[in-house]
Amino acid sequence: MKHLLVTNDFPPKIGGIQSLLWEWWRRLPPDSFAVLTSPHADAAAFDANEPYRIERTREPVLLPHPWMVQRINAMVKEFGADFVVLDPALPLGLVGPRLSVPYMVVLHGAEVTVPGRLPLARQVLGHVLRGAQHIIAAGGYPAT
């Protein structure tokens, strides 16, 4: 099965989530997935050294809007992806129900604690999680 990872947080951008995603995905067969992510000044050199497909948008941040849904669906069709992995669950997970294939979300600790304090955000996160085929917990805290 092939899939598409859609994220704002991918190397060469530096950070904990970026490192986690890279460590997880670099261990997969390179022809089993592609990445759609945001731009970075050092992306050309990084992307050239990776054995899998990385496509970067022009927009500095991937946000849930109709154009993003179209972009993801087009890449799904072209690549032949069977499902999409969205990271983070909020806000990117909001595009999930509009995708042409099933979606999964990566759930981080902040996405559990912040919506817990904001009633509307809690409802939105609940909607995203209920629609997801699978939820990938990024650690023990969001898993519980």
Where are these regions (language model features)?
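Charged helix-capping and loop-helix junction motifs
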Residues: 119-126
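A short, active-site helix/loop in glycosyltransferases that binds the activated sugar's phosphate group
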Residues: 132-144
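A short, charged, and often flexible helix/loop element on the N-terminal side
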Residues: 47-75, 85
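Short His-centered aromatic/hydrophobic patch
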Residues: 86-92
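N-terminal subdomain of nucleotide-sugar transferases
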Residues: 1-42, 50-55, 130, 134
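Structural alpha-helical scaffold elements that stabilize or flank donor/cofactor-binding regions
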Residues: 77, 127-128
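A short, histidine- and acid-enriched strand-loop-helix "catalytic/donor-clamping" loop
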Residues: 13, 63, 81, 93, ...
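Short, charged/polar "capping" segments at the starts of alpha-helices
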Residues: 41-46, 143-144
